[in-house]
């Protein structure tokens, strides 16, 4: 597969992942699937917008760049047949790094939240974090420490786990594009587009 075609494939995969991450983050604002009375009762990590900013917005821009590489005009560099696509592929590596950082941000926030557990109403009628160092992950009986919102533990655990997996996949795809982009920069794409009058390798 040409480097441009590979980039398009990666971009096509990143777009739905980004939308999935945004949706998961939005759902975290409704713990247990319910509207909460006081926003202060939401887990702090929800407000870091890991899925909306990290896996979402910061990933959409690289994905669009990757999608555009398939039809990139090789004459885009002062009419030079060889450097147009090479420059575009090099630029894509920069966007891939940005995407990697965004996905990494979402991944870290999700991991911290999973380990910390959700903010909820505890037995002493105060709102806080009843779990420590992810102890609730191996002992479902501890979930009863959270009185309200109902089902907040499985809700947060599921959504942050989704964001964790999405972030990991996005980071992997961005690393692949960095390698793909460097190969495209050094070796060129499979062939030059017809506008230059050349059909051979870049």
Feature annotation, model-predicted:
Residues 2-123, 163-186, 191:
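Signature of small four-pass
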Residues 3, 34, 77, 84, ...:
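Residue-level signal for well-ordered alpha-helical segments
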Residues 193-202:
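Non-transmembrane, juxtamembrane loop and terminal tail segments
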